[in-house]
Structures are given as structure tokens and as C-alpha cells.
Curated annotation (Swiss-Prot):
PROSITE patterns xref list: ODR_DC_2_1, ODR_DC_2_2
UniProt similarity note: Belongs to the Orn/Lys/Arg decarboxylase class-II family.
N6-(pyridoxal phosphate)lysine: residues carrying this PTM: 57
Reported cofactor(s): pyridoxal 5'-phosphate
SUPFAM superfamilies named among the record's database cross-references: Alanine racemase C-terminal domain-like (SSF50621), PLP-binding barrel (SSF51419)
Gene designation: tabA
Signal recorded as keyword: no
Name assigned to this protein: Protein TabA
Purpose of the protein: Involved in tabtoxin production and pathogenicity.
GO biological process per UniProt: lysine biosynthetic process via diaminopimelate
Residues annotated as signal peptide: none
Length: 420
């Protein structure tokens, strides 16, 4: 949906001069709103043991991660590079949750060395690690109606987590290996806007945790319910009631664990930063090909979600409101027909040179970018709380793109030299 009134009020007066001096396309984020959204989440759970871990995969840009760390957020990492990024920014020990899948032993060892809260996605890894983390946590696989109805796909085909039926034995095996401190992780929905469904998804994890703890004879120090809270991408979407959501989960946690209530952890990414970013681009082409086509200087390399998922992102021409409307396809320049930001979208009639804003790109936007076709990833800017615009990641260049190339091939293996 459109960026907030506060963001628009501070950004729009700057856009004309900014885009005359700084080339489009670029993502720009609202520092004030990202910080405030984190604070809102923390406040909703303020009367309970709780910590939010920002999902690095959503927006792995150091300037943003540093802001959130200073606010008391932890970082949710799922790869070695994300771990290294978190450590480079000063995150230590339980500032980091490592929740990954299809994970190599070396990656687990790296997370263990960082002192992170490690989530085992597969029980077989428990047998391979030489030393266990201080707290052993397993991820329960998505299951039930909520998981099937979310963007996570069919729960029966999920690659994530351990089937619920195997959890008790997994914890018993960890106990036999000497583990005495435990947590549990589960994420049962994705981009969920229904309060009822989001609560049900969280309660499922809490109830599974209570049953497993009882049957395995262990105590849980924390329950991590992952992310999953949605944002209103469409104009008619309604934002989830955060206070009601938090209150329902706190009640469920107390009911399931009346004594020694575990700490609640969350790994929100999209919810924290998603609404507070916009991709600023410019119209560079207009043509008719049986359909009215509007070409932007941004491509799918800057925002993959519409092409990959068919995801909706609100798109506006901020300085074209008085023109007659028409129906247009808005496209990028990749040699792929799915490089489209919008199809059959009602818009004021665009002119070449118009600015076009694609909204809600503060999560899974730049982070999912790629360089196919030599279309490089754009810059990232931030509108600071003081009203300044700062560059937090420059646009990629030809040298960046070709940096790993060996222009003169390097011999790495020659079978004729092998000793038989």
C-alpha cells in the first residue's frame, strides 16, 4: 500500500531535486519508521520475557541492522555470510539466532563458535556436531491448516523443520548427549494479515512446545515462533492488530506454561522494514504491443517478488495525478517476459521522464536482487530521522560484476599431472 503519510510528507518534497542529482533507480528507506516499528513490537510484549530478532535476509544492509541492534533487537541469521555480517556489526552470543535449513556441518560449527542460539533444522545434524550449543533447539516443521493456507506452500511438501512426531525423540537424544538447556522453534505462517490465523499459528508452536517438554521430561527456556506477520501490500488490506496479537500469545504462553514460563522470541523481518522502503525509478519508454507498455529504468534485478511470486506491489506516479487514467503493464528491461512490476494496472497516463514509485520494498527487495542479463543492483539510500538523505549502499558497477572473473583462466586441476 502507499508509504506512510509521514514518510511521504518528508520524502516527496525532496524527490525532484534528489533525482536530478542522484540517478535512479534506487531504494530509499525511512529510518524513523523502521525504528518505531521495532519499538512498537517491543512495547507490545514489554510486560513479558521477550526478544525480537530481525530477519537479516529481509534487508541485509549494515546501516539498517546497526540501527536495530542499538534498539535492542537481535539478528536472525540463516547463512555464514549473515553470521559474519552480524558479528562485524558487533552482535555477540545470544544477540544472534541461527535458524537455517539444509545446513552443512561447517556452517553449524561457525554458528556454535559465534555463541549464537542455534536451531537444528534436522535431527541428523545433532549426531554430527562435535560439541552441542549451550541451548539445544529444534525446529518443528509447518503443519496444520494455517501452514497450508499461507505463502509457505503445502505443509506436506515443506523442506523446513522436523516432523512433530519425531520431536520428543530428538530432545531425548539431545539429553542423552548431555544437553540440559532447551528451546524450540516453529514458523507456521508467512505474511499473514489475519489476526485469528496469526494467533493460531503462534499458539500451535506454544502448544507443541508444551507437549514435547512434558513428554520428553525437559524444560524449555525459550519458544521461538519465527516471523510470519504480514504487511498490507494492497490498498484494501488491513494491518494486523499488533496489541491484540501480542496479548493473545502472552495468554497462551501463560496457560501452556503456568510455571517457569519460557521466554518468547520472534524473527520478524518484513513486518519491521517492509512498509518503510520504496523503489524510486523513472519511466524511460512507452509503447503499444496489443497492450499498453510502460518501461522503467528499474528491472527485476531490483525487485524480484512480482516476477517470482506474482506478488502485488503498489505503484504510483507521484507527480501525474491530474492526468487521465489507463491500464498499463509496467516492465523492466530483462530478456524475460516475467520481468514485470505490474500487469493491467490502472495508472495516470505515464510520460517519459516521470518518476515511478514501487512501494513496500523495505524487505525482500534489494536483498533478493540478482545480476542476470548484466542488469546490476541499484543503490540503497536512507531518509534519516534528521531529514537528510544518506547513501547506505552504492549501485553496483561493471567492476563489481566482473570482480570474481578470472580473465586469464587459472589451472586448478590437470589430470595429466596426477601421479598414478
Amino acid at each position: 500500500m502507499p508509504i506512510s503519510e509521514s514518510f511521504a510528507r518528508r520524502l516527496f518534497p525532496l524527490l525532484d531535486e534528489l533525482t536530478n542529482t542522484y540517478p535512479t533507480p534506487f531504494h530509499i528507506y525511512d529510518e524513523r519508521a523502521i525504528v518505531q516499528t521495532h519499538r512498537n513490537v517491543a512495547q507490545a510484549f514489554a510486560d513479558s520475557a521477550f526478544r525480537q530478532y530481525f530477519a537479516v535476509k529481509a534487508l541485509p544492509t549494515p546501516a539498517i541492522l546497526s540501527l536495530l541492534l542499538k534498539e535492542g533487537s537481535g539478528l536472525d541469521c540463516s547463512s555464514p555470510v549473515e553470521l559474519m555480517l552480524a558479528e562485524r556489526l558487533g552482535a555477540r552470543g545470544d544477540d544472534i539466532v541461527f535458524t537455517s535449513n539444509n545446513t552443512s556441518l561447517s556452517e553449524y560449527q561457525m554458528a556454535l563458535q559465534a555463541g549464537a542460539l542455534v536451531t537444528f533444522d534436522d535431527r541428523s545434524m545433532l549426531e554430527q556436531v562435535i560439541a552441542l550449543p549451550d541451548i539445544v533447539a529444534f525446529r518443528v516443521s509447518p503443519h496444520g491448516v494455517i501452514a497450508r493456507s499461507s505463502q509457505m506452500g503445502n505443509a506436506q511438501q515443506s523442506k523446513f523443520g522436523i516432523p512433530e512426531a519425531e520431536l520428543v525423540q530428538s530432545y531425548r537424544e539431545a539429553w542423552d548427549r548431555g544437553a540440559r538447556r532447551f528451546g524450540i522453534h516453529g514458523m507456521m505462517c508467512a505474511n499473514e494479515l489475519s489476526l485469528e490465523a496469526a494467533v493460531q499459528a503462534g499458539v500451535q508452536v506454544i502448544e507443541v512446545g508444551a507437549r514435547v517438554a512434558r513428554e520428553a521430561g525437559i524444560e524449555l527456556e525459550y519458544i521461538n515462533i519465527g516471523g510470519g506477520l504480514g504487511i498490507p501490500y494492497r490498498i484494501d488490506d488491513q494491518a494486523l492488530d499488533l496489541t491484540a496479537y501480542a496479548d493473545a500469545l502472552k495468554r497462551a504462553l501463560k496457560q501452556a506454561f503456568p510455571h517457569n514460563t519460557p521466554k518468547l522470541l520472534m524473527e520478524l523481518g518484513r513486518y519491521i522494514s517492509g512498509p518503510h522502503g520504496v523503489l524510486v525509478s523513472r519511466v524511460i519508454n512507452r509503447c503499444s504491443k496489443g497492450r499498453e507498455i510502460v518501461g522503467l529504468d528499474a528491472s527485476m534485478s531490483a525487485l524480484m517478488r512480482p516476477g517470482l511470486y506474482g506478488a502485488y506491489h503498489h505503484l504510483t506516479l507521484p507527480f501525474a495525478d491530474q492526468r487521465p487514467e489507463g491500464v498499463f503493464d509496467v516492465v523492466g528491461a530483462l530478456c524475460e517476459n516475467f520481468d514485470k512490476f505490474a500487469v493491467d494496472r490502472l495508472l495516470p497516463s505515464p510520460l517519459i521522464g516521470d518518476l515511478a514509485l514501487i512501494h513496500d520494498t523495505g524487505a525482500h527487495g534489494h536483498a533478493m536482487g540478482f545480476t542476470y542479463n548484466g542488469r546490476l543492483r541499484p543503490a540503497e539510500l536512507m531518509l534519516t530521522d534528521d531529514g537528510d538523505v544518506v547513501e547506505i549502499r552504492r549501485a553496483e558497477t561493471f567492476d563489481d560484476h566482473t570482480g570474481p572473473i578470472q580473465w586469464q583462466p587459472v589451472d586448478v586441476f590437470n589430470p595429466t599431472r596426477c601421479v598414478k
